[in-house]
Amino acid sequence: MKKLCLVTYTRKNECYTQAIDLIAQKLNEDFMGDFKVVICCEEMIHVPQSNYEIDIFLKKGTKYRKLISLMENDDSLYYLSIDNDISGNIPAIRQFVKKLMCQRVDIGWGRIYVDSPHGLISNLVGVDKLLSHNLIRPTLWSLGVGISVPGQIFCIKGGRFRGNLINLDTFLDDLALGLYVNVNNCKKYIVNKNLGYERPNNHFWGLWNQRKRWAIGYGSILKGVFGINNYRWKVIIHGLGYHFSWILNWAIAGLLLVKFFPICILYLIFLSFIIVGKNLKMLPYAFLYQFIFPLFHVVWMISLVRFLSKGDSNEYYS
């Protein structure tokens, strides 16, 4: 039994990254060896030599299913889940894990931002990340209807989740995990600090296809829990908050445009400031985001309708 297990996930042609190794080295120092890394993968990969324990867990399927299966076969006290493509803010992660354990909570998370965006698409993704992590997610959780956990980095108490998570086969682990946390009133530790950076989509079609995948993942969760009233409405509210709020924004802007054009522009600029906060270099992209990014929400909506119309009403929950 280890006190902390860092879990990461690799797909085909991916390797254990130096960024994850650096995080692991520091955490191993903090826990004086009461620590290990588990790499969840579908086929054997090369494991570098290290001064801490590294195990391979072979499992096919989604990241969510891999995490569930790992906990069924492992007895670590805490699991720090980090995506393989994340560059960690190591001082923040170390402090986050220590405080989480001291407070004896069930789950904790922080914020994730985009790593060095360049070009229009990646900067729009960066704005979307700011909007999600700084505004939408905190607001929904504060209202008691949040179900989204940053899937890139989170830490959970093994005994609270082992054998208890909703048995969904979805690649949106952030929603499946967050839904369980909400419905079961798990104790949370949420920090406003940035815990890491992820590489953004740099291409139009890459982002387009990502939103289609997200719609299918969301739809699979909605189908799976549709028969449970408390679950169903929270999943629906999440979809409305993340993918339909732009409609309200356009409606307000449209009303102001009819009344007085400069007021409409000032409103959009003001909202851009709210989204980016202190990250003022993103301000121009936040303004453009309000006009361009709704296209990708429409792609999400259409993909969701197509998926739901297939009529496969399989119940994935248990």
Language-model region placement:
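Cell-envelope/extracellular polymer assembly enzymes that use nucleotide-activated donors
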Residues: 2-7, 36, 176
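Short beta-strand/loop segment that forms part of the nucleotide-sugar
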Residues: 8, 33-44
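Short, well-formed alpha-helical segments that are part of the catalytic scaffolds
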Residues: 12-28
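Glycine-rich, basic loop-to-helix element that forms the pyrophosphate-binding segment
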Residues: 58-74
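Long helical/loop segments within the catalytic core of UDP-sugar-dependent glycosyltransferases
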Residues: 64-66, 90, 96-163, 168
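Short beta-strand-to-loop acidic/aromatic patch adjacent to the donor-nucleotide binding site
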Residues: 76-87
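Catalytic donor/gating beta->alpha subdomain of glycosyltransferases that bind UDP-sugars
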Residues: 100, 107-133, 168-170, 177-235
